[in-house]
Amino acid sequence: MADAPIAVVTGAAQGIGLACAEALNEDGYKVILVDVQDSVHKAAADLGGVGMICDMGDVDAIGALFDTIEAEHGPVSALVNNAGIAMPGSFLDYDLDAFDRVMNINLRGVFVAMQRAAATMVEKGIEGAIVNMSSINAQVAIPAIPAYCASKGGVMQLTKVAALALAKNNIRVNAVGPGSIDTEMMAGVNANPEAFKMAMSRTPLGRSGTAREVGDVVAFLCSKKASYVTGETIYIDGGRLGLNYVMS
């Protein structure tokens, strides 16, 4: 895969990010898996990719990350901004440091990574693809995670802005918005029968999605099959956003 295009996936040590990396690897990309956790190295080795450590809330670290990738592997053709956190808390006394931390990773980090990847794409004439991880919580709110909901709404709008700004360079920018996906973030819901029943009552397909189902949509958006798709957020939610009543 010496001449394979380079794809970078953040938050790739597990869950949705790892599934995105797997799908892109199958599509012929050389995948750089990025995470703040050391376990990203094993995940990358198992996949035949490259693991790198980066805190996506640290602007300087993001710059250094892309410097290293470009120097050691070449310019990036596809970027998947998946890294994100959710820090719960009461709206009335939500900690501002927590708010800033969520925004720095979930929104500012996405912006900075897009800027850096896109600048090189423009310079090298690469007609690349960027996919950002939004959420159904860009559209529907959960009071206990105010910063997360706000950040994912921001990602949705920032995706549109970037898509319009980069269209003249044939760089496509899209987002995906997962619903209830069977990952570690949903482990608490899955372990609680009542909570799981409530989540499924709002999901017409009646089941959780899999991380790979998200990864496959991301890979599609990075592919030439989606060559006329830009500025969109595709919701992978089992029909949840279209529902205006509770399923029995």
Regions found by a protein language model. Give the residues of each.
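Residue(s) in the substrate-gating loop at a strand-loop-helix junction
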Residues: 135
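Substrate-binding pocket helix/loop in short-chain dehydrogenase/reductase
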Residues: 90-91, 98-100, 199
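Active-site loop immediately N-terminal to the catalytic Tyr-X3-Lys motif
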Residues: 92, 140-146, 168-169, 206, ...
